[in-house]
Structures are given as structure tokens and as C-alpha cells.
Amino acid sequence: MTSTSAGGEQQDYIGKNSMDSYEVKKVTAPVNWETDVPGSKSITNRALLLAALCREQVRLQGVLFSDDSRHFLSSLQSLGYEVQIDEAACAVEVHGHGGSLPVTSGEIHVGSAGTAARFLTAMLGVAEGTFVIQASEQMKKRPMKPLFEALLSLGASVEWLGAAWHLPVRITGAGAHIRNLSGQAVLNLDISESTQFLSAFLLIAPLFPHGIRIHITSAKTDGSYIRITRRMMEEFGVEAVFDGCDYMVQAAGGYQRSGYQIEPDVSGACYFYAAAAMTGGSAKVHHVHWSSMQGDMKFLKLLEQMGCTLTEEDDGIRLNGPSDGLKGLKVDMNDFSDQALTLAAIAPYASSDVTITHIGHIRGQECDRLYAIVMNLKNAGITCEEGDDWVCIHPGKPQPCRIETFDDHRVAMAFTVMGLGCDGIEILNPGCCKKTFENYFVVLDSLLKH
């Protein structure tokens, strides 16, 4: 059995690999792995905002340190928050400032972090003061319009510093107007492009003195990441109620918490589980349990439908892949779409077609992920068809090719798994994984060496 940790310093990749490309090493036998993964990005960035809105000092443990979370941390520091960082201990202490910001002007850079972009824009849009929000070229292309429309309806003003309805912007918050409201704030919100828009307003709800009601105008009204947001809000002392159409947060005393433990990243764990499923091997990721709040736990159940067996042990869930190969299936992945790439990457090894539906929104993420799936599979000689929100992948043997990652961490990590089962797969720009899992390839190489 091979075991490794996600911690430690960044290292060079072994073999003929560099930061420009990574040549995946085909495994010659079913994998038998145990490993750790870093903390959850989604939980880390929600916890950072919740801690900043507390009225006390909050110690966060199990923090993910990656490109996304570092941009979130540096943005909080740019806004005047006192933050102590201990990367070796995966810990951060945030001195909360309650219902107000430490400063009334400033500039932040959110990089490519969608959570930082949506959450912090919402917070600044209901604060008092004027702020500039900068972003990476990738983030400048991602959807923001429903968030800006909601902020404008609340009384914020926005100056576009680039394309309209996109970052970068100069925003003057609606704090004075919101403070003078005589009753509950009400807004309409379309979350069809991203549930982060709703999570953003739920997280900042305690900044509204008489509470807030959010009416969802899109067909999609809920999702796994919204449920993470609501659960974490409750753990920090504030309840968000959903009646099927509207989300309501009553006026409350604000968030309260002195410490918080962040779960391991299930999204990152899924790549190791997928490798075991594909090769008919075994994988256990430490501290991943069925009690996790993360929606990507559904991917493990999906692998079970494809023929894998799952066992919860004291220190994590173990997956054993089928000795006779994976079964094909048709699955709606709308609620755990980050793993659509992972399923697509192992789909050629299934015994029958794999069809993934209701994932049209992934076209507007770090890249057009549906396009990335189809283009890379076809480059590998795999037959597939796509529609606006679905893809069907036929069984086949992947041929040597270079995987275009489009600077998208999930494209890189998912198609690396495909390369474990065949020769000649080269991942371009593997450094894009720094967004959420800095040493993914270091961990993988350590597992492959044994």
C-alpha cells in the first residue's frame, strides 16, 4: 500500500515533467493508495468571510492554502482586517469586525477566485465606502451580472472599469441606504449561472439590520453549495430559512464563533477515488467521511453505481474498484458538476456509454468545461457527442495526446486520471492546479513511486 500526505513544501515533479507540462505515467497494476488532501476551498473561503463578519477573533484550522484562498486572505488584509497566517499548521486567525468594515476605501485583487469575487463584491456592495475590485483575465470573463443587478437594486453604484457587468469595477456600497431601511430588505436573484450569487448574499445577511428576503427568479433554486453556506451560517449562529421560493434571514446579533475546523477537500479526494475505480484498485482518503457537508460526496455514490464498493473506516472512506471494469450510466450532475470532468475522464474505460446531463452552467466557469471535455476526449481518439448541457462518451482506448487545460485546475487534475490508464498523455500547464491543490502532482508522483 502506498500512503502520502498533501502537506509539505512545493517540489519539482519527477520524471520528464516541468511546470510547462506533465507526462502522466501509466500504471501497470491496480492502484492501492492512502493519502491526505488539503482543506476544502469552498469551506475555507466561506469560513474566512464568516470569521471577518464575527465580532471576535476566530481561529480557523485545516485551512486550504492555494491561489484562491491566498487572494481571499490578501483581500481581507487590504480591507484592513487583522489576519495571522500559519501555513505550516494550516491555520488562520481572523480578527472579526462585526457588521462594519475596518476601512471605507481601498482596492482588492481577487485573482481567479470565483468565491472571493462574488462574496467580497457583495460585501463591499452593501458596505459604506468606495472600493476598487480587480481580477485576473480569467475572472473578468466569468458571469457577475445577476450579482451586480441585485446590488444596484439595493442602492449601490457601480463604475465599470472594463466590460459592463464584469470585473474590474469601482463600487460604492449601499451601506448608508441599508442602515436606514425601516424593514426587511428584499431582492430578486437569478442563480442559473452560479449559486455563488446566492451564497454571497446569504453570507452577508447579518449586515442588514432588519434581515433580508431573497426571491429566486430562476428555475434553479437550491444546490449543494448553497446547503454548505446555510450549514456554515448556522454553525456560526445565524439561520437561513428556505420556503421553496425565497430565502429569509431574520435580523440577528451577527455571527459568533471562536474556532472552526475545515473539512478536507472532497473535490480533490475524488481524483484519487476515480483512479482506483478506473484501475480496479483501492484508495482511501484520510478524514473523508459520510458526515461531510460537501456535495461532491455524491460522486462516490456515482462510482458505487458504476460497480465500486465503499467502506467507511475510522480514518476515512475506502473505495475498491470493480475487477471486471466500470459500468456505463446516465447521470444528472447539476448538483455536483465539478466532478463532471472527472467522470468524463474515466468514462472511456467504462463498458458502455456514459452520459452526463444538466451541466450547461459549466460552460461559464474557469473555462468552457463542456468544450474542454469534448475537445480533449476527441484529441485522445474517444468518440463523444455534446449538446448545450450534456455530453455522451463512448467506450474506447485513449490515444497519446496533449491535454489543453485552458488554465483550469479541474481539467488538469481530471485528465491526469485518464492518463493513468494509457500511454502518452501529457498535461499542459499543470501549474494551474495551484488554484485549489498546489501539490497535486507531487502527491500523485509520491504515490506512483511506490
Protein language model annotation of sequence segments:
Residues 1-9:
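Ser/Thr/Pro/Gly-rich low-complexity, intrinsically disordered segments
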Residues 12-450:
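Structural preference for solvent-exposed beta-strand-turn elements
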